[in-house]
Amino acid sequence: MRALFLAASAAVLTASACSAAAQSVDGAAIYNRCAACHTATGKGVPGAYPPLSLDFRQMAAKPDGRRYLVAVVTRGVAGPLTVEGKPYRGFMPAQSGLNDASVAAVLNHVGASIATTGPAFRLFTELEVAKHRASSADLNGAAVAKLHAYLSGAK
């Protein structure tokens, strides 16, 4: 019984530490890179860079959508996208230099402070990002764009 308690306590502490690590990274500072294209407010640039608003929140509300959002940051996007009924050329380079805590932090910044329209936002954890990064390792930018089309119903 004591061993079970210790194992459960260790799991809770590990999950808490990973969540705290993602929250201690400054997602707003990382987002400054994103703002060069998506703008500081996340409104994007018509035809070129999509807004980070309702589409982001809708994706973040679905398990496969959360994987997609991690893949966008870690694998990039290459190909046409339709976001909120408007076409975009769909190119974003992979931000492969970001560790899992940084990816979680920037996604959490967008979901909590920029994309404020749509379903309730649940924070990403470092562990969740690591899981989605691993499951998306074989995707290239074109596959990520197709994943967006599939998840948004534009198949």
Residue ranges and their predicted role:
Residues 15-31, 57-61:
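Electrostatic cytochrome c docking/interface patches
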Residues 83-84, 95-96, 100-155:
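Flexible coil segments in periplasmic/lumen-exposed cytochrome c-class electron-transfer proteins
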Residues 27, 31-40, 92, 106-109:
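The canonical Cys-X-X-Cys-His
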Residues 23-26, 30, 65, 69, ...:
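Stable alpha-helical elements in mature extracytoplasmic
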Residues 1-4:
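Positively charged n-region of N-terminal signal peptides that target proteins for export
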Residues 7-16:
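Bacterial N-terminal signal peptides
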Residues 43-81, 89-99:
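Gly/Gly-Pro-rich "capping" loops immediately C-terminal to redox-active cysteine motifs
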